[in-house]
């Protein structure tokens, strides 16, 4: 072990090992696929409570609503949603 070493394997040695690539050849694509499905099925919208893209505006509106009173913004938006 070299002076000042923490006892960990060097990064280059890790990424050039066959064991690393056997493990990561499965886990990295699985994480990507899971994330893609999480977003594409709409589960992300439900999990985080964000509105879906088609519910940002009501059908009668053509642009984003403008809040005119800073401290009464919630009341203005609630009135808009009724």
Curated annotation (Swiss-Prot):
Similarity comment text for this entry: Belongs to the PsbE/PsbF family.
Subunit field text: Heterodimer of an alpha subunit and a beta subunit. PSII is composed of 1 copy each of membrane proteins PsbA, PsbB, PsbC, PsbD, PsbE, PsbF, PsbH, PsbI, PsbJ, PsbK, PsbL, PsbM, PsbT, PsbX, PsbY, Psb30/Ycf12, peripheral proteins PsbO, CyanoQ (PsbQ), PsbU, PsbV and a large number of cofactors. It forms dimeric complexes.
An example Gene Ontology biological process: photosynthetic electron transport chain
InterPro entries noted in UniProt: PSII_cyt_b559_asu, PSII_cyt_b559_asu_sf, PSII_cyt_b559_N, PSII_cytb559_asu_lum
Required cofactor names: heme b
PANTHER family: CYTOCHROME B559 SUBUNIT BETA-RELATED
Gene of this entry: psbE
Protein name: Cytochrome b559 subunit alpha
Superkingdom assignment: Bacteria
Membrane topology of this protein: Single-pass membrane protein
Cofactor note: With its partner (PsbF) binds heme. PSII binds additional chlorophylls, carotenoids and specific lipids.
Segments crossing the lipid bilayer: 22-36
One Gene Ontology term, aspect cellular component: plasma membrane-derived thylakoid membrane
Keyword Electron transport tagged: yes
GO molecular function, one term: iron ion binding
Location, primary (coarse class): membrane
Positions of heme binding: 24
Biological role: This b-type cytochrome is tightly associated with the reaction center of photosystem II (PSII). PSII is a light-driven water:plastoquinone oxidoreductase that uses light energy to abstract electrons from H(2)O, generating O(2) and a proton gradient subsequently used for ATP formation. It consists of a core antenna complex that captures photons, and an electron transfer chain that converts photonic excitation into a charge separation.
Subcellular localization: Cellular thylakoid membrane
UniProt entry keywords in alphabetical sequence: Electron transport, Heme, Iron, Membrane, Metal-binding, Photosynthesis, Photosystem II, Thylakoid, Transmembrane, Transmembrane helix, Transport
Keyword GTP-binding: no
